[in-house]
């Protein structure tokens, strides 16, 4: 690889994309990669998600199209060659169809390799685009992309199967989910031992259908009968709690105001505010139907929190099959039992079995593994034997 052209995502305060480019650039520099970031234009400087829930629908499209304008100019100038690689941080990058259109009509020496990261989309039945009615056209888009890219990066072994049974043909590589642990620790360094922290369980996912808000609120009410001092919190980057269904917001605010749960909604959190809350919390909880690895688990682990997630889809892999981090989906009773066990371990300062720090260490290696896949084809999963890797622990 002569040069890497990096097609990143626009920055949002409430999303991991705020830091994603810096995480990548740090590893590129460490590895001695000759790279160029292809930037786009932003609609405004709010760094806010207004239309949609994952990324802003207008902002995402505007940024991506302007990114492509800049890359097209470089290709027109002959600055991008067959010895180069273009890497897209997200498969859905509006305007991507121009790439095969130009390359198929260009001399072979001006056809770079193209790799991208596939995060979810139509192969996940619980992805937001399914509930928004985007399946039919998005699947056709994905099939188009699968015709011309050189490789697809995914976060977990479990997701490989979803792509293969959907008919994807191109090489698939398992890398983990990109994360920059050192950058996060530079923002906030946890100093308070777990047993001295606020008795708090946090929830850091979107407050939307696919994250099952009602399950979390059911748990909060049930655990109030076990330990009324344990706070159940929502960590939200928006100025007000936002959801695709108002009923989730209404119930959360009612719980906060009522006396059936110790419930608190934190809103308007900047990234460092969120990290400081994690650094003073004991547990991060997840009950998502749709989550492939999740940056929240890496962030919580970095901040010294215990993490309790469902034994579902990619999470056994995320935790290297450590049952202490997982509960039976979707059992409130089992989640309560696991929380009680965590509380006992915290109170007695016996935490070795939770492997704190190792979870985020593995994801911290994702960007390096992505480079290795592009350079050497490492961690490729074939068409017939991809399931043999599923039960193997990624770390010890």
Which residue ranges define each predicted feature?
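Glycosyltransferase donor-sugar binding loop
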Residues: 230-249, 267
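Conserved donor-binding/catalytic core segment of Leloir-type glycosyltransferases
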Residues: 190-224, 232-233
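Donor nucleotide-sugar binding/catalytic pocket of nucleotide-sugar-dependent glycosyltransferases
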Residues: 147-191, 196
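Nucleotide-activated donor-binding/catalytic signature segment of Leloir-type glycosyltransferases, i.e.
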Residues: 246-269
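Aromatic "clamp/platform" in nucleotide-sugar-dependent glycosyltransferases that forms part
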Residues: 288-290
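A charged, aromatic-enriched C-terminal amphipathic alpha-helix characteristic of glycosyltransferases
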Residues: 330-333, 337, 341-396
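N-terminal pre-catalytic "stem/leader" segment of glycosyltransferase-like enzymes
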Residues: 1-98
């Amino acid at each position: 690889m002569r040069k890497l052209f990096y097609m990143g995502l626009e920055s949002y305060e409430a999303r991991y994309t705020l830091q994603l480019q810096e995480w990548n650039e740090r590893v590129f520099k460490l590895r001695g990669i000759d790279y160029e970031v292809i930037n786009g234009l932003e609609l405004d400087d709010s760094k806010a998600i207004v239309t949609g829930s994952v990324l802003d629908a207008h902002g995402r499209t505007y940024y991506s199209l302007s990114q492509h304008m800049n890359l097209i100019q470089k290709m027109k100038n002959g600055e991008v060659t067959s010895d180069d690689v273009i890497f897209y941080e997200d498969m859905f990058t509006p305007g991507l169809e121009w790439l095969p259109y130009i390359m198929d009509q260009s001399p072979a020496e001006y056809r770079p390799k193209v790799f991208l990261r596939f995060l979810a989309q139509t192969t996940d039945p619980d992805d937001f685009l399914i509930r928004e009615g985007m399946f039919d056209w998005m699947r056709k888009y994905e099939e188009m992309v699968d015709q011309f890219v050189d490789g697809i990066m995914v976060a977990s072994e479990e997701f490989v199967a979803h792509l293969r049974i959907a008919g994807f043909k191109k090489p698939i590589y398992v890398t983990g989910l990109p994360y920059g642990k050192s950058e996060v620790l530079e923002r906030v360094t946890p100093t308070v031992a777990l047993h001295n922290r606020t008795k708090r369980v946090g929830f850091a996912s979107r407050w939307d259908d696919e994250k099952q808000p009602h399950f979390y609120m059911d748990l909060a009410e049930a655990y109030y009968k076990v330990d009324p001092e344990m706070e159940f919190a929502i960590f939200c980057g928006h100025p007000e709690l936002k959801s695709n269904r108002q009923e989730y917001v209404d119930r959360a605010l009612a719980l906060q105001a009522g006396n059936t749960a110790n419930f608190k909604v934190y809103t308007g959190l900047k990234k460092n505010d969120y990290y400081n809350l994690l650094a003073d919390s004991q547990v991060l909880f997840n009950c998502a139907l749709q989550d492939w690895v999740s940056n929240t688990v890496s962030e919580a682990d970095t901040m010294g929190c215990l993490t309790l997630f469902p034994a579902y889809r990619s999470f056994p892999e995320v935790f290297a099959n450590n049952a202490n981090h997982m509960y039976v989906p979707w059992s409130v009773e089992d989640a309560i039992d696991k929380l009680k066990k965590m509380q006992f371990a915290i109170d007695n300062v016996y935490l070795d079995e939770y492997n704190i720090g190792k979870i985020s260490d593995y994801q911290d290696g994702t960007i390096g593994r992505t480079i290795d896949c592009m350079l050497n084809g490492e961690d490729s999963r074939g068409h017939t034997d991809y399931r043999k890797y599923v039960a193997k622990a990624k770390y010890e």
